[in-house]
């Protein structure tokens, strides 16, 4: 029950402010947030894993069968991801692109991207086992994003965009499913309560860095 309570709490904390924001704006008429920035796992990866050597990919059928154009973009979904729906509802953009997409436009950078990588987690060991982008590397990509944004819009406007951006972090289940319950190293080091506290501490550290 501990991991489930943690996930439910995270969803509750994220949903309340977003539900107010969605009620405060007519879709596609005005923006509450100038940009959206995403960190996490397969729940928020729009295709970053397409550009790294990992088995955790979703750029083939049946993924994307309900996506516009019926294209498998790398999203672990038959259609859009939650960040896409939020970005559209909040009037930011129709789709949140992958930061590693080489076709990323200046307009995409102005309105935000996702650094998420399917198979990742708060525990670096989780991402290492899956050969995907760990959270700390996602932070490095975020720093690179800031530099690119500053070159496009200037330092002052970049600060305004970043300060007003909606930031979403979605991860944690892989730390338990692909790590704690699947390989012995962490389960020998922690009991379930101890590992939950470890993951929560990693989340808190990540938020402080962001």
Where are these predicted regions, by residue range?
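Conserved active-site regions of diverse hydrolases
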Residues: 2-210
């Amino acid at each position: 029950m501990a991991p489930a309570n943690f996930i439910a709490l995270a969803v509750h904390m994220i949903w309340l402010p977003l539900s107010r924001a969605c009620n405060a704006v007519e879709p596609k008429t005005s923006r509450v947030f100038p940009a959206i920035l995403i960190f996490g796992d397969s729940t928020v990866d729009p295709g970053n894993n397409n550009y790294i050597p990992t088995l955790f990919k979703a750029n083939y059928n049946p993924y994307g069968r309900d996506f516009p154009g019926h294209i498998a973009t790398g999203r672990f979904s038959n259609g859009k991801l939650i960040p896409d729906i939020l970005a559209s509802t909040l009037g930011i953009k129709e789709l949140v692109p992958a930061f590693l997409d080489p076709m990323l436009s200046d307009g995409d950078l102005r309105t935000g991207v996702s650094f998420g990588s399917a198979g990742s987690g708060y525990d670096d060991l989780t991402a290492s086992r899956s050969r995907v982008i760990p959270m700390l590397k996602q932070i490095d990509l975020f720093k690179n994003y800031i530099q690119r944004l500053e070159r496009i819009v200037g330092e002052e406007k970049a600060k305004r965009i970043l300060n007003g951006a909606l930031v979403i972090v979605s991860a944690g289940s892989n730390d338990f499913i692909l790590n704690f319950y699947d390989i012995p190293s962490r389960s020998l080091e922690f009991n379930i309560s101890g590992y939950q506290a470890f993951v929560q501490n990693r989340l808190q550290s990540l938020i402080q860095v962001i």
